[in-house]
């Protein structure tokens, strides 16, 4: 039985991780975020009530769960407090069940200013960031000039460090990007106001998780974004600024990698992407590509970013990119989400290879974005189904064509589909193998 489960996205994010984490945390004691920031958007629907979380782990709606934000997460105190407020208004005791690593890098207003100024300066070559300061905060961390949560509790030292780093960044804002500088006094005052609010939630995450492991507590690690957005393994440079893959769990939480158990890869029954970057199986982007099936996927699937509200680009399932995600993450099993969105389509396609300009046929996706751009997808066609799969809770409720589609994805990837999601609510799910019982 696996006590430690990793849940991560295998595509370009927005795969439906939040729902699955919420579902599986019925059996968990801890849910841990280990990378990213409030650029994530995890949507939960429980008894018809919708909750969107960006920074707080998706287990917060479970009374039995303690939630942890690990050191690999870049933390905006302002965003965190704004996210906590409506949850507390609903009677959820967030401060009693949410804990934060003192080593989390802080996102402060100058990071946001830098992020937005850079995107504007890039023009039509913009990466498509959320503009929330994620990348600049990670840059400060790597350059060893970043401020961390633990720094908030020494006002004198914090003020000195802040002054130095803001002089550095304001110089770039004014002289390179030609925008207004960020006020040091305002940032300092705001940051100091966070110290008293956060102090009760700050813990030694590594020690807490190790003690939990020794007790036999069940721990779930919740990934944000998706494998193909990983800073090292994604479609660089159209990626996020953190390691979204299974390898990021240990580094971003301080939990020993040898203790990780089942790794669940969340994948949509089709593909979506938000923002810029290559997308070989793309059908619809709302601009140049207007394939009606792609539009159907976006409309029926409600494909708008939970964080940005941006229209998601849509396309067919890509087994080639999935094979790369499986290699990187050593998946134990997959969860196929939004199967019901395919209802009513007469014909389905699965990308089984990339035809490259040099005549070669790739069965595993390349690393660089440039190589992705030149790939022409090779499709295998399968019959669709007219029956309604929405809300199905057993395999017996699925039409044979849907079962064939699921089986074909398993055959093409070599990984079992252990969970099938047929709707947004936590109970609209078919669980073949439970990760905590695998």
Curated annotation (Swiss-Prot):
Q: Check the record and name the InterPro entries matching this protein.
A: Adenylosuccin_syn_GTP-bd, Adenylosuccin_syn_Lys_AS, Adenylosuccinate_synth_dom1, Adenylosuccinate_synth_dom2, Adenylosuccinate_synth_dom3, Adenylosuccinate_synthetase, P-loop_NTPase
Q: What top-level class of enzyme does the UniProt entry assign? A: ligase
Cofactor: how bound: Binds 1 Mg(2+) ion per subunit.
The reaction(s) catalysed by this protein are:
IMP + L-aspartate + GTP = N(6)-(1,2-dicarboxyethyl)-AMP + GDP + phosphate + 2 H(+)
Some GO term, biological process aspect, for this entry: which one? 'de novo' AMP biosynthetic process
Q: Where in or outside the cell?
A: Cytoplasm
Per the Swiss-Prot or TrEMBL record, the active site comprises 14, 42
Q: Which PANTHER family match?
A: ADENYLOSUCCINATE SYNTHETASE
Q: What is the recorded function of this protein according to its Swiss-Prot or TrEMBL entry?
A: Plays an important role in the de novo pathway of purine nucleotide biosynthesis. Catalyzes the first committed step in the biosynthesis of AMP from IMP.
Which named protein is this? Adenylosuccinate synthetase
């Amino acid at each position: 039985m696996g006590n430690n489960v990793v849940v991560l996205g295998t595509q370009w994010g927005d795969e439906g991780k939040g729902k699955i984490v919420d579902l599986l945390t019925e059996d968990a004691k801890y849910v841990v975020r280990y990378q990213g920031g409030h650029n994530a958007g995890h949507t939960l629907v429980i008894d018809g009530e919708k909750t969107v979380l960006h920074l707080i782990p998706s287990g917060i709606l479970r009374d039995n769960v303690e939630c942890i934000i690990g050191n690999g997460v870049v933390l905006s105190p302002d965003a965190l407090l704004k996210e906590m407020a409506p949850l507390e208004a609903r009677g959820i005791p967030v401060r009693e069940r949410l804990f934060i690593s003192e080593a989390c890098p802080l996102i402060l207003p100058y990071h946001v200013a830098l992020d937005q100024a850079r995107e504007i300066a890039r023009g039509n070559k913009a990466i498509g960031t959320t503009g929330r300061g994620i990348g600049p905060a990670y840059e400060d961390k790597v350059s060893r000039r970043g401020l961390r949560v633990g720094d908030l509790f020494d006002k004198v030292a914090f003020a000195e460090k802040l002054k130095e780093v803001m002089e550095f960044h304001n110089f770039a804002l004014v002289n390179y990007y030609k925008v207004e500088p960020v006020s040091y006094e305002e940032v300092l005052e705001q940051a100091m106001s966070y110290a008293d609010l956060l102090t009760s939630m700050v813990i030694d995450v590594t020690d807490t998780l190790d003690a939990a492991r020794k007790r036999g507590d069940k721990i779930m690690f919740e990934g944000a974004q998706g494998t193909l957005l990983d800073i090292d393994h994604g479609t660089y440079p159209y990626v996020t600024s953190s390691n979204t893959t299974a390898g990021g769990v240990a580094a971003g939480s301080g939990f020993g990698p040898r203790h990780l158990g089942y790794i669940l890869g969340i994948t949509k029954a089709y593909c979506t992407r938000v923002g810029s970057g290559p997308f070989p199986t793309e059908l619809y982007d709302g601009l140049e590509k207007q394939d009606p099936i792609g539009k159907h996927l976006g409309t029926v699937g409600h494909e708008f970013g939970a964080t940005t509200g941006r229209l998601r680009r849509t396309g067919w399932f890509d087994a080639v990119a999935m094979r790369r995600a499986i290699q990187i993450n050593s998946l134990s099993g997959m969860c196929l989400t939004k199967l019901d969105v395919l209802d009513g389509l007469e014909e389905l396609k699965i990308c089984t290879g990339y035809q490259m300009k040099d005549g070669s046929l790739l069965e595993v996706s390349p690393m660089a974005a440039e190589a992705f751009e030149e790939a022409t997808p090779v499709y295998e066609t399968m019959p669709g189904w007219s029956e309604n799969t929405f809300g199905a809770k057993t395999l017996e409720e699925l039409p044979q064509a849907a079962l064939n589609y699921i089986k074909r994805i398993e055959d093409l990837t070599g990984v079992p589909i252990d969970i099938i999601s047929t709707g947004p609510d936590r109970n609209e799910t078919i669980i073949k193998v439970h990760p905590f019982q695998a």
